[in-house]
Amino acid sequence: RIRKPIFAFPRF
């Protein structure tokens, strides 16, 4: 999901 860019980019 696109909730946090730090967890959504590296962890998608």
UniProtKB/Swiss-Prot annotation:
GO cellular component: extracellular region; host cell postsynaptic membrane
Phenylalanine amide found at: F12
Cellular compartments annotated: Secreted
Organ and tissue specificity: Expressed by the venom duct.
Single Gene Ontology MF annotation: toxin activity
Processing after translation: Both amidated and non-amidated conorfamides As2 are found in the venom. Amidation is important since amidated peptide is more active.
Keywords: Acetylcholine receptor inhibiting toxin, Amidation, Ion channel impairing toxin, Neurotoxin, Postsynaptic neurotoxin, Proton-gated sodium channel impairing toxin, Secreted, Toxin
UniProt function note: Conorfamide As2a: this amidated form is active on both ASIC channels and nicotinic acetylcholine receptors (nAChRs). Potentiates ASIC1a (EC(50)=10.9 uM). Inhibits desensitization of ASIC1a and to a lesser degree ASIC3 currents, resulting in a sustained opening of channels in the presence of low pH. Inhibits with a slow reversibility human alpha-7/CHRNA7 nAChRs (IC(50)=689-3867 nM) and with a rapid reversibility human alpha-1-beta-1-delta-epsilon (CHRNA1-CHRNB1-CHRND-CHRNE) nAChRs (IC(50)=208 nM). Conorfamide As2b: this non-amidated form is only weakly active on both ASIC channels and nicotinic acetylcholine receptors (nAChRs). Shows a very weak inhibition of peak current of rat ASIC1a and ASIC3. No inhibition or very weak desensitization of both rat ASIC1a and ASIC3 are observed. Reversibly inhibits both human alpha-7/CHRNA7 nAChRs (IC(50)=2971-7036 nM) and human alpha-1-beta-1-delta-epsilon (CHRNA1-CHRNB1-CHRND-CHRNE) nAChRs (IC(50)=707 nM).
Family, per entry: Belongs to the FARP (FMRFamide related peptide) family.
Official protein name in the record: Conorfamide-As2
Organism of this sequence: Conus cancellatus
